[in-house]
């Protein structure tokens, strides 16, 4: 339905200015200007129509690269997330060394961030043995790649803040899954999920619970030495636990 709406907007934009004008008479500057006008008016389908015409008619214009970036944002604002991600990925493939790749990585991370449902809601609706929520994980990886490649990007601070939020949510998810395995007496599975959280999401406050899960699992397996070692790591990292650990 959203794709149909976007198509209607695009057709309306073409009709408003004349299809022949867009195809033949408008130069790159005017095409881009008209696209920006459509964008500012909230007509994202019309904006895409102008930007795509600019790309098709003037592929080597300096404005074409900016138009390609604007198409990503227009799709995003129109609610066409898959199209926005595809446009961002295409830009990265065609322009791997372009200085604005930081923007495409940021937009991909933002789109996945917006798509990620509340993890606690998912925990009560899906099998607890399911893998971590894909959209949250993808968003985390996109922001991670952005910070690795473009540490001085204007989007770096926002990406970092979102990563902290995602890191904590994903670590919490892993703990919920590990608790599930602990209740099922699948102690090796519980240890592996807790270890995964510790290795993948360093710095998350939820890792205190991850260590507690490992201690409990080791004890139930009769591995008292490993339980004691993990207890020392817990105390060194977080001090004495403030609450008694429970698997419920």
Where are these regions (language model features)?
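Sec-dependent bacterial lipoprotein signal peptides
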Residues: 1-17
